Design a protein with these regions (language model features):
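Conserved helicase ATPase core of P-loop NTP-dependent helicases/translocases
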Residues: 114, 123-172
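Post-DEXD/H (motif II) to motif III coupling segment of the RecA-like Helicase ATP-binding lobe
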Residues: 3-65
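A short beta-strand-to-loop transition that corresponds to the Sensor-1 phosphate-sensing loop
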Residues: 25-29, 119, 168-170, 186
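Short, high-confidence coil segments that cap the C-terminus of an alpha-helix
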Residues: 19, 109-110, 161-162
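Conserved interdomain linker/interface between the two RecA-like ATPase lobes of SF2 helicase motors
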Residues: 44-117
Length: 186
């Protein structure tokens, strides 16, 4: 996840260890703030574009669909650094948890699904709404969830005992769940 190396905090660490050899590896070479990896690292040793990784079998083909929710208007939210502010987005999306849950359950069917929410409160309201639309096991976790509990939830998901895994910013990087076949970005 070397794309984080361009952050102010990481730059201080790299400057402190100025003579150290640093190898950076990331699947996210472009940052929303426009800072390129070439500003942190001397050279790119290897680049493997998505267009090559898919046919080579390293990435699955994906299908992206959008399902507008009646009455939901995101235009009232102002973007910061290219993204909608999580707090305002989470608050707004929590109001639409029920219709969103209906869409997720309808579209996911019986597929193992990971749901990404904007905030902790949003994740918990979305999980509660999902439970009203499905008899399948739905679990939610956030940064405040005990690590052992999170580990157990993930193990249960990978074993097929949890159908929907709802989270707020914890399974975004370095997370591997090959059985997941549906992702909902809410």
């Amino acid at each position: 996840e070397c794309h984080h190396a361009a952050s102010d905090e990481m730059m201080k660490v790299l400057e402190y260890f100025i003579h150290a050899f640093v190898l950076g590896v990331t699947a996210t070479p472009k940052r929303l703030d426009g800072i390129g990896m070439e500003e942190v690292f001397e050279a790119v040793a290897f680049h493997y574009p998505i267009e090559e990784a898919r046919p080579d079998g390293w990435l699955l083909d994906s299908r992206v669909t959008e399902h507008p929710i009646e009455g939901l208007d995101l235009s009232q939210l102002r973007k910061r650094a290219g993204d909608l502010p999580p707090e305002a987005l989470g608050e707004l999306m929590a109001e639409y948890s029920m219709p969103v849950a209906a869409n997720i359950v309808r579209l996911a069917g019986d597929r193992p699904t990971i749901v990404f929410c904007a905030t902790v409160a949003h994740a918990h309201s979305q999980a509660a709404a999902l439970r009203r639309y499905t008899d399948a096991r739905v679990e939610v976790a956030d940064g405040g969830t005990d690590k052992g509990v999170r580990r157990d939830i993930v193990a249960e998901f990978k074993a097929g005992n949890v159908r929907m895994l709802v989270n707020a910013m914890i399974w975004t990087e370095g997370f591997d769940a090959p059985n997941a076949s549906c992702i909902a970005l809410v």
